[in-house]
């Protein structure tokens, strides 16, 4: 029985005393382990990046087979001979985010190089919504490209963010630097509003509604509820692409702005714009913004997806891995207020921060700054911070275009304070990574861009084993049913045994690279390659 239930039903004196005792321990910031999720045969839903607000890529599903196969793709869109396959859906030519599943719908981000709707042509960002049982395309959201080109919206990258679903609404960050709230039913149940300009949005996004020519809409089109343009409203400058998934609380949508450097990789066009913001979940209005100076110290960009906890070291906290290599904890419900020019600004309260980039990566023995984008140089945080057992785990890395280099995974205990005092351990054998750690049963699994997968003790950082996939890795690990699943650039889904003892179970080969993270929802394993989404049924 949890403490909240004790407060509601607390009629037994001894249990009330126990509850007060636990509260006293929590107030001192001592260990209060997160209970392991109960085993669910089908794993439940997967409604957001990281499955829940902790960003921990693990599933309580059981009975997952390891003999599933990709089969041979056919011209009619099927995969002949694929074992355990329920359906396969064709996407565009590139996909970097992760699928999400909620209430009978599957959401993915891709591009439009292989149009699913004949009237939608040209390079665009695309969100597709599929029927969970059949893989039928229910509707899609067409997002025009920015005029800025590759400096802020690289060709054919599509939408790199994952949709988070909350009831009737889905929230996503577009390739245009917008945060959009969508009706998960699309236009099938009408244009619900309050936004009514979907026909104009398709021509120029939120930025060009006034001059855009409307296009014809049908029931396969997306229904926008509200939208917030971070570029227009905040003056931010996304570098190459806007790439981050939002996290939500009961009131707010927290999102990275993807603010970064310009084409020179030296200048920061918007050093005073926020790197993290909060929007009102119902209206899309700006509710708060980061004011810690992150944008002044950006190495490349802010691409990490924030995490959220309603009680981390005794406070509701939004955790952000930033473009300066630092992990921040901000109060998630209280904001400072500052007036300037007759306007009142709500600013995030910084609770703590930890530099996750080791000093020896920033400065050499002679005291000289080490150049960025060199093998021994400093890195920002691109992977997502993970909250597990009242601690935060964060890993540094860079844009894969910069190649391989030194990395680090840092374990942070916010109850210890801020800065170096909050560091529990730091593991430096890992290389640069854009992969998010997964934690289960006291173990941490982390992959690096070089292709290696590490198993560490979550409490001490001790390494138990490592595995080399011999291929670059963009996605993250999924821990499920005593197994660790990990896709790589060679199109291999590597499956290892979870635990302290190393054992490779099998490798499943696909005809295209896997840059996304596999997920499990409702007795189904989803594997997303660059071009197709495979749905495998099990245990039904």
Language-model features: locations:
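Bacterial N-terminal signal peptides
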Residues: 11-21
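Conserved S/T- and glycine-rich ATP-binding loop of Class I adenylate-forming
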Residues: 1, 15, 49
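Short, low-complexity, intrinsically disordered N-terminal modules
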Residues: 6, 23-26
């Amino acid at each position: 029985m949890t403490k909240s239930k004790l407060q509601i039903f607390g009629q037994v004196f001894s249990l009330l005393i126990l509850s007060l005792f636990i509260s006293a321990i929590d107030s001192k910031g001592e260990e209060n382990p997160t209970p392991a999720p109960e085993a669910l045969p089908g794993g439940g839903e997967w409604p957001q990046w990281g499955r829940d607000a902790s960003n921990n890529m693990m599933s309580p599903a059981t009975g997952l087979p390891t003999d599933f196969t990709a089969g041979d793709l056919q011209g009619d869109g099927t995969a002949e001979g694929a074992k355990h396959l329920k359906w396969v859906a064709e996407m565009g030519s590139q996909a970097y985010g992760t699928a999400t599943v909620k209430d009978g719908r599957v959401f993915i981000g891709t591009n439009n190089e292989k149009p699913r709707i004949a009237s939608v042509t040209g390079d665009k960002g695309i969100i597709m919504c599929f029927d969970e049982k059949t893989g039928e395309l229910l509707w899609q959201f067409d997002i025009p490209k920015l005029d800025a080109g590759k400096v802020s919206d690289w060709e054919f990258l599509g939408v790199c963010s994952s949709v988070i679903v909350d009831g009737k609404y889905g929230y996503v960050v577009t390739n245009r630097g917008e945060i959009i709230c969508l009706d998960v039913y699309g236009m099938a149940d009408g244009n619900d509003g309050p936004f009514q300009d979907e026909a104009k949005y398709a021509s120029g996004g939120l930025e060009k509604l006034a001059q855009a020519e409307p296009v014809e809409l049908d029931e396969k089109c997306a229904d926008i509820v509200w939208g917030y343009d971070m570029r227009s409203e905040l003056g931010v400058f996304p570098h190459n692409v806007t790439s981050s998934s939002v996290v939500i609380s009961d009131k707010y949508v927290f999102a990275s702005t993807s603010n970064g450097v310009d084409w020179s990789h030296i200048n920061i066009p918007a050093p005073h714009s926020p790197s993290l913001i909060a929007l009102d979940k119902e209206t899309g209005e700006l509710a708060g913004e980061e004011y810690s100076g992150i944008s002044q110290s950006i190495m490349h960009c802010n691409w990490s997806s924030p995490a959220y906890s309603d009680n981390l070291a005794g406070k509701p906290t939004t955790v952000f891995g930033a473009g300066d290599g630092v992990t921040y904890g901000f109060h998630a419900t209280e904001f400072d207020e500052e007036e300037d020019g007759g306007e009142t600004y709500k600013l995030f309260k910084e609770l703590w921060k930890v530099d996750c980039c080791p000093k020896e990566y920033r400065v050499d023995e002679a005291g000289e700054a080490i150049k960025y984008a060199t093998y021994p140089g400093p890195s920002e945080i691109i992977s997502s911070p993970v909250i597990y057992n009242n601690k935060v785990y964060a890993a540094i890395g860079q844009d894969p275009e910069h190649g391989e280099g030194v990395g680090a995974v840092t374990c942070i205990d916010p109850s210890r304070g801020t800065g170096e005092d909050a560091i529990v351990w730091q593991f430096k054998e890992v290389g640069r990574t854009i992969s998010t750690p997964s934690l289960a049963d006291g173990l941490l699994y982390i992959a690096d861009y070089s292709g290696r997968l590490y198993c560490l003790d979550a409490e001490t950082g001790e390494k138990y084993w490592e595995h080399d996939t011999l291929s670059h890795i963009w996605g993250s690990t999924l821990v499920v049913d005593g197994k660790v699943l990990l896709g790589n650039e060679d199109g291999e889904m590597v499956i290892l045994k979870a635990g302290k003892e190393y054992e490779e179970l099998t490798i499943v080969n696909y005809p295209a690279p896997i840059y996304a993270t596999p997920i499990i929802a409702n007795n189904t394993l989803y594997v997303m390659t660059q071009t197709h989404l495979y749905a495998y049924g099990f245990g039904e």
